[in-house]
Curated annotation (Swiss-Prot):
One Pfam family linked to the record: Ribosomal_L39
Protein name listed in UniProt: Large ribosomal subunit protein eL39
Gene Ontology MF terms: structural constituent of ribosome
GN (gene name): rpl39
Taxonomic lineage from the root: Eukaryota, Fungi, Dikarya, Ascomycota, Taphrinomycotina
Keyword Transcription regulation listed: no
Basic residues bias (residue ranges): 1-15
Gene Ontology CC: cytosolic large ribosomal subunit; preribosome
Main location, first listed in the record: cytoplasm
Length: 51
C-alpha cells in the first residue's frame, strides 16, 4: 500500500477500520438479544480487503 493514497482508497480503508471492531457490551444486555459477537471481524494478516 503506497503512502500516497487516492481519496477513494482512503475512504475504503477508513470504512473497513470502522467495521472491524467488537460489538458494544450494552447490546449484549438487551432483552431477547441473539447477537453474541461480531461475526464479520477481520484480521489484517489472515484476510485481505482486495482493494
Amino acid at each position: 500500500m503506497p503512502s500516497h493514497k487516492s481519496f477513494r482508497t482512503k475512504q475504503k480503508l477508513a470504512k473497513a477500520a470502522r467495521q472491524n471492531r467488537p460489538i458494544p457490551q450494552w447490546i449484549r444486555l438487551r432483552t431477547g438479544n441473539t447477537v453474541h459477537y461480531n461475526m464479520k471481524r477481520r484480521h489484517w494478516r489472515r484476510t485481505k480487503l482486495n482493494i
